[in-house]
């Protein structure tokens, strides 16, 4: 799981997954775009990279590997809500990990909901913190 916006992180992760035939799911939690728009951007980047490297992978495999969930966008890009702020607060207090409402905090809150809604239990889960630390300081006023 990770925050997906422009799609480049997701495209890179999926390229690695496809090239090395890794069966694990890579789920991008959209922080701004609806799935249909973001999905095509990611697919285009994957196709471009694989073509440049002369690696042949079926369109069907590529399409099956791009998982974007846009259910947790919330009020919009760069806008948090109390649930996202609570997630940021908990991660900072309990784990010492700063997050922001635009990217990582929103995606982490979305991941928690995704896991619960999809009944994922007793599984190893990886969340990739892709940055956004400077934006964390914008959230300080909400972390009291």
Outline where the language-model segments fall.
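Active-site-adjacent helical/loop segments in soluble small-molecule enzymes
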Residues: 62-122
């Amino acid at each position: 799981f990770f925050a997906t916006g422009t799609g480049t992180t997701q495209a890179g992760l999926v390229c690695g997954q496809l090239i090395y035939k890794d069966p694990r799911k890579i789920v991008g939690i959209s922080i701004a775009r609806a799935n249909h728009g973001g999905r095509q951007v990611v697919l285009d980047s994957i196709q471009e990279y694989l073509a440049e490297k002369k690696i042949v992978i079926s369109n069907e495999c590529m399409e099956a590997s791009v998982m974007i969930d846009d259910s947790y966008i919330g009020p919009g890009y760069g806008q948090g809500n109390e649930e996202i702020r609570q997630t940021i607060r908990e991660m900072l207090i309990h784990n010492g990990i700063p997050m922001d409402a635009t990217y990582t905090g929103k995606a982490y809150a979305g991941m928690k909901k995704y896991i619960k809604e999809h009944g994922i239990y007793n599984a190893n889960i990886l969340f990739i913190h892709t940055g956004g630390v400077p934006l964390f300081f914008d959230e300080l006023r909400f972390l009291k």
